[in-house]
Amino acid sequence: TNLTDILSKVKNNRVQFLIGPVYPSHFDEVSSFCRSNGIRMIVPFSSKAKQVNVNRYVYLLNTPAEYEKILAADLFLKTFKGKSVLFLHTNKADQPDFTQYLRQRLLVQGATVVDANEDATIAQLKTALNNKRHIIVVPDASDVSALQNVFSKLSEVRQAMPKTELSLIGYSSWLNQSDRYEGELFLNDTYIFTPSYYEP
């Protein structure tokens, strides 16, 4: 039995999800087939299925953190091209790999990058932000206990700089708190990176 015969059987049986293929050499053919037929392809065996970047029917399971970091940074650079970025350093930093990697990528692209501690005064932040129109805030903590401090700091910035638009980058652990913090998440124009689903 060859791959074409197997895919023909899959199509005839109206399959909704396809787990595999096992061999990376089959990824291109199977992902194209899945796109053409509206079948979701779940790849549990490899983190190198580049098709996930261009085919909304391809899903990766067990994606290594290194690959997630690269995908998140790529998506950030595409979504927020040309925006100023504030890295907010907290006392509960648990995302240094991601924030440092993102910071390096932004600097290579010539983006305006500002670093500030969560205990910085409003005067210090106003000076650092220098009346930028739209600022993307990236905290270095995904811990929910740091979330309230981040919201408080952004509220202070919003009051002191009413003409500045703020957007917040969040982490998937925050989704568990969406009922509790729904208003603040919307107010802060929050974008949450999550490994649960990725559609470029």
Which residue ranges define each predicted feature?
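Short beta-strand elements in bilobed, periplasmic/extracellular small-molecule ligand-binding domains
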Residues: 1, 55-57, 106-119
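Short, well-structured alpha-helical segments in soluble
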Residues: 2-16, 123-131
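Short, well-ordered alpha-helical microsegments
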Residues: 3, 26-28, 95, 122, ...
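Periplasmic-binding protein-like
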Residues: 14-23, 42-44, 84-90, 131-150, ...
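Extracytoplasmic ligand/sensor domains, especially the bilobed periplasmic-binding protein
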Residues: 19-88, 93-102, 176-178
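Glycine-rich, charge-decorated loop segments at or immediately adjacent to ligand/cofactor-binding or catalytic sites
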Residues: 51-59, 121-126, 174-188
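Extracellular/periplasmic periplasmic-binding protein-like sensory domains
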Residues: 151-200
